[in-house]
UniProtKB/Swiss-Prot annotation:
Sequence positions that bind carbamoyl phosphate: 58-59, 108, 137, 140, 264-265
Enzyme class at the top of the EC tree: transferase
Keywords from the UniProt entry: Pyrimidine biosynthesis, Transferase
The enzyme's E.C. designation: 2.1.3.2
GO biological process: 'de novo' pyrimidine nucleobase biosynthetic process; 'de novo' UMP biosynthetic process; amino acid metabolic process
PANTHER family: ASPARTATE CARBAMOYLTRANSFERASE, ORNITHINE CARBAMOYLTRANSFERASE, MITOCHONDRIAL
Gene name, Swiss-Prot/TrEMBL: pyrB
SUPFAM superfamilies: Aspartate/ornithine carbamoyltransferase
Binding-site residues, L-aspartate: 86, 170, 225
The name this protein goes by in its record: Aspartate carbamoyltransferase catalytic subunit
InterPro entries (alphabetical): Asp/Orn_carbamoyltranf_P-bd (IPR006132), Asp/Orn_carbamoylTrfase (IPR006130), Asp/Orn_carbamoylTrfase_sf (IPR036901), Asp_carbamoyltransf (IPR002082), Asp_carbamoyltransf_Asp/Orn-bd (IPR006131)
Amino acid sequence: MNELPLHLLNMRSLTRDHIEKLIQRANYFLTQGMEKNSVFETLKGHVVVNLFFEPSTRTRNSFEIAAKRLGAMVLNPNLKISAISKGETLFDTIKTLEAMGVYFFIVRHSENETPEQIAKQLSSGVVINAGDGNHQHPSQALIDLMTIKQHKPHWNKLCVTIIGDIRHSRVANSLMDGLVTMGVPEIRLVGPSSLLPDKVGNDSIKKFTELKPSLLNSDVIVTLRLQKERHDNSVDIDAFRGSFRLTPEKLYSAKPDAIVMHPGPVNREVEINSDVADNQQSVILQQVRNGVAMRMAVLELFLLRDFRFF
């Protein structure tokens, strides 16, 4: 196995073996930890800080629950009343928290590569990228890969279709990287041309501007919301809804046992119809549940740095 990176900043730093072992460990935490309400002591005595400069429900709360289930102390500073609001630089804040004994820095920021810049400032400790701009969101990709494998265990036979605002989606970037690493042979990106990336960088990735053809023979369908905060409001929401909203009629074009995913937050009746979001093919809430277990596995691995302890 290749050496584990010091920080979790992007998906390309993880090998297939890293990802498989993380999924295995997360499934353990799901069955032996969460379902039994167990608390572990792996992170006992360690301090985790959630530094979220953008809104979050699922990611921030699941990291907090994950850290507490591993025995850590968790800080959730109100950044609006922190010293940053008085003019202190972000990096001085980081060094201050490090001096207080914080070991894990869970960082979400609107600017690309801010977590990487923070990692360069640390003498010790670990930075986990919880989403930076439209760049990367590695823990969400790991959750999505875990969820896919629970239903579709053979990576080399999968067709995964990702629908929506892919150009501005850090979730899509990380998921594509992860799917390529796992050897998925067919990855389809679907949306209006203005919301698709200019380049895809891998032969397994194809672009579509019509929904129904992209769904043929799909095993996994991932819907994404419009990232309105990351671009101007030039997207015609009604036109997007009419062409790219996943409805029961359109879902019929996919395989009968296809699963439907969404990383959240869901904008119902825009990218996905409620009848699809709530039907038996939807695994959206399973993704949320898996989120705590996978983030437990991530925190444990980046502390112990060795799968032999698993």
